[in-house]
Amino acid sequence: MKTSEWIDISQPLNNDIATWPGDTPFSYEVSWSKEESGSVNVGKLTMSIHTGTHIDAPFHFDNEGKKVIDLDVQVYVGPARIIDVSNLESIGKKELENFHLEGVERLLLRTSSHGKANEFPDVIPHLRADIAPFLSEKGIRLIGVDVPSVDPLDDKELAAHHQLFKHGIHILENVVLDHVADGDYELIALPLALSDADGSPVRAVIRPI
């Protein structure tokens, strides 16, 4: 039987990609060309960790929180379910109660609210804090969203971030889901082995189960 092909659900990183207002712009350049070195091109990359498709570590919002290197990589690999939650201003327990989520460990939410990697949104659907205990009761260990944050963009309390990790749920942001159907997939979204970082870019891919 032919194995299904992997589907990329990552935002391509290039010099046009949007970043959080005031954060470090993405930049890639060849800093040492083949003509200069005589053998190879060597690139230089400058970026914020929270550009494009990425994961958050607790250190992002808690000075005492775990850093990327301390996170369990098993969480970012395995079966995942994509569900559609379009046309909602916020998402919490109430909005998810009618979905069958028993046995789901990784949940990706399609809000279809923005979808423009080169434009930072003015407002996004956000997760309410009551989603965390609900997801935890279902056994979910990772939540993914197709927007830059699980909290409102102008929020300073970051209640969803705090409650999700308090309940053992990891955060994946800025996945691209408009080109894939609802259903069950195998997910790989591994962070880099960054020792002191508050997050990491990932190449997120899925394939149907």
Curated annotation (Swiss-Prot):
Its cofactor is Zn(2+). Transmembrane segments: none annotated. Belongs to the Cyclase 1 superfamily. KynB family. Zn(2+) 2 binds at D56, H161, E173. It catalyses: N-formyl-L-kynurenine + H2O = L-kynurenine + formate + H(+). It comes from Bacillus cereus (strain ZK / E33L). Keywords: Hydrolase, Metal-binding, Tryptophan catabolism, Zinc. This is Kynurenine formamidase. It is an enzyme of class 3 (hydrolase). Binds 2 zinc ions per subunit. HAMAP family: KynB. Its EC number is 3.5.1.9. Substrate binds at W20. The gene is kynB. The active site is at H60. Zn(2+) 1 binds at H50, H54, D56, E173. Homodimer.
